[in-house]
Amino acid sequence: MQFSKFGEKFIQDSPILQLMDDLGSALNSDTPINMLGGGNPANIPEVSAAYEAALQQIAASGAAIESVSNYASPQGDAKFIKVLVEFFNRRYGWGLTSDHIVLTNGSQNAFFYLFNLFAGQFCDGSHKSILLPLAPEYVGYADVQVEGSHFVSLPPIIEKTTHEGHEGFFKYKVDFDALENLEELNNNQIGAICCSRPTNPTGNVLTDSEMAHLKQLAKKHGIPLIIDNAYGAPFPNIIHTGASLEWDDETILCFSLSKVGLPGVRTGIIIAHPKIAKAVSNMNAIVNLSPVRFGAAIATPLFENDEIIRLSDELISPFYKKQSAFAIRRLQEEFADYPVYIHQPEGAIFLWVWFEGLPISTTKLYQILKEQGTLIIPSEHFFVGMQTADYPHAKECIRLSIAQDDHTLDQGIKTIGEVVRQLYHN
């Protein structure tokens, strides 16, 4: 049997496939596994109870059965879109209309659309790429483009820092000197700029100043700035440093219901210029007919009365801040006298750990830890759009999920400590 080039692209091994396969294997395993590698959000009992109440409410009202027994338009559930318009205008005064919002079957679906809209071959014969202002970035971006992989990214400025008075931390910053002199940007070979904020995998939050600079660059070159806000404000608000949220017609904001604790409903939200929203809606019609409505049905009452804000601010964000503090303490206990650094824990549901001068790559470390019942994600695949052969830092980091209970975090970090200390000694 032969597949097309399109088919061959999507059946080959890829980092996101590895991540999801390992997640599935861990969830179905009879052997206890310290699952520090996946992107699944935590099960927070009080949050789950709120969703159960919302489910009961829509079941009693008939909204649940109505949502699964009828298609939405390709744009998405009309009632939820109306509620979202009111929600964002109430909080930010952006002057949105329903034409500015389109729903997708999760954020991954949204970025498949957006990255194929703004990168690849254009009608005039030119080829353009997506610019990621710094790597590492979300591994799920890497393989979504139909025609090859069209990404350009730059290594970050690495600044060693302190956190709450403690040494052993660092922060990534955008290298704007390199960015402004980037050949592809200045030769009209970039179709859009994209960043996640907070960043998956590092928890980095680009500062307001950095975001303003990126916006200015995008405007200068006549391209959109895409912001992946899956972990940001106002929901799930897993962000532990000051950061404002801005939008205009030249910005594309992407949200998700996944990290508020509803990954299974596969609901993504795009806020963009109506022309872009319409293009995504058309793609929905061809690829999916229409987005799934069930997530919209659950979420509608939570956005109508701002319950989603209470859940985010009072339960979700504090939970991850607590887990972050616990994991940091354990990592510093395990590596007190080793060249191990943690990225500033500014947000998201991960910690990014740098083993400076590690004798092996973290891809090999991943295999060793996997055999010992602990799953992490190695760093190399997160450097999307970058050549890493001569960049050792790209092979020295791991992503740890903090969406686990204390026992799993403790045992997983203990195993990592034992293995990595031995590697340094050898």
Language-model regions, residue ranges each:
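Conserved core of the PLP fold type I
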Residues: 66-221, 226-248, 252, 423-424
